[in-house]
């Protein structure tokens, strides 16, 4: 494409010549890969020539109603009613009645869960970087666990044998029921 004296029918662009050859580099770049139709130029403008592939017969279809949507629509009013009922009960009840930290024995069984979350699978680079931190943390934890062990070993709650530290080898959790009615009954029978 030469610039000398030609009038371009397409959109105007700045021509830059290299070594006086008169080749419009920007025009060539815009026309590249076009196959003579305008190339990227047509895609840059919103009101460019419509692409024949985009004008294929697309139809709007109706999607069936989701049963999940019906369930949500019935659940939300029930939730709103329950919230309103709870607000009224909270206004009428004495202060502290709905405090979740106050548990009475009359309320029934209470499940206390102490959960520790930590990442099990770490990448090698993270393990190498955190190995120093882990050694410092483990020394601090061991000193803390010894202090706790001295104070609680008489009660039999936490010992070196039953303490579970993150990144241990066995990887299995231990569930222990504390202060259950069955264990209280056993203790009473043993004391008799």
From Swiss-Prot:
GO biological process, alphabetically ordered: box C/D snoRNP assembly
Protein's cellular compartments: Nucleus
One cellular-component annotation, GO: nucleus
Signal peptide annotation: none
GO molecular function per UniProt: box C/D methylation guide snoRNP complex binding
Residue list for modification Phosphoserine: 34, 66, 180
Superkingdom of this protein's organism: Eukaryota
Compositionally biased spans, kind Basic and acidic residues: 164-177
Sequence intervals crossing the membrane: none
Region (Disordered): 1-39, 118-192
Keywords from the named record: Chaperone, Nucleus, Phosphoprotein
Acidic residues bias locations: 129-152
Keyword GTP-binding: no
Function per UniProt: Client-loading PAQosome/R2TP complex cofactor that selects NOP58 to promote box C/D small nucleolar ribonucleoprotein (snoRNP) assembly. Acts as a bridge between NOP58 and the R2TP complex via RUVBL1:RUVBL2.
Quaternary structure and partners: Interacts with NOP58, RUVBL1 and RUVBL2; the interactions are direct and NOPCHAP1 bridges the association of NOP58 with RUVBL1:RUVBL2 even in absence of snoRNAs. The interactions with RUVBL1 and RUVBL2 are disrupted upon ATP binding.
Matches recorded under PANTHER family: NOP PROTEIN CHAPERONE 1, SIMILAR TO DNA SEGMENT, CHR 10, WAYNE STATE UNIVERSITY 102,-EXPRESSED
The protein's name: NOP protein chaperone 1
Organism for this UniProt entry: Bos taurus (Bovine)
